[in-house]
């Protein structure tokens, strides 16, 4: 399923659509359908041009982040409640040990800073850092931001679905331990849902929340987003001139919407 999601995501992406259009145009030209090839080629160029413009970020990117703004501004860490743990989703840091001993901060590295801010503000002591190679890539920056290593737990996962399932298993185990009495028999009584502050990029939060609602229903999730990249970029205006950064943002946004819609259909 992991690789199927990757393939489908590429095929419906702006770049995937552009490649498909180009291939169809070439095939039509080779078959002698030159007029049709020109039309398809022109539409493909227009398609890619559109997705490379900042104006499309307003259409597909900004709506992903809007509900997480408070009066049009990024919420302060002081506004979030105290919780049992901070769940820091992966995808913001990376490391290639064959190349360097130091991790690279990607565009979503604000997530790590947000988790550290929440920790230092006393919102939760435990930080669960997820992702592929989270210890190697993320621990160093968390420690630089003042989070003690003893407060950090790591969960290897390749995508958001695996992160939600893994965090759910961690808390199922914790709840079981809490409700065991001295004889090792599970005691009866009301089970209180553990509360976590979910930290990820604002544009990713809608889909992440859906995954946690499905795969970790025993957890109360409070969204604590960082990295409002779409909203920040959209502040630059409604330009229709193409640029590579807009193509990147819009491709990310389309990927998120495909995941959200796909989840709704599969649910």
Task: Name every feature range the model reports, one short phrase each.
Residues 1-29:
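Membrane-embedded alpha-helical segments of integral membrane proteins
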Residues 3-8, 56, 60-64, 254-261:
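Hydrophobic alpha-helical segments of integral membrane proteins
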Residues 23-24, 49, 261:
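Hydrophobic residues within the alpha-helical transmembrane core of Major Facilitator Superfamily
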Residues 29-37:
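Membrane-interface helix-boundary motifs at transmembrane edges
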Residues 39-54:
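Hydrophobic membrane-insertion alpha-helices, especially the h-region
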Residues 50-246:
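A structural signal for short, hydrophobic/glycine-enriched beta-strand patches
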Residues 244-267:
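Structured C-terminal subdomain patch of bacterial secreted/periplasmic proteins
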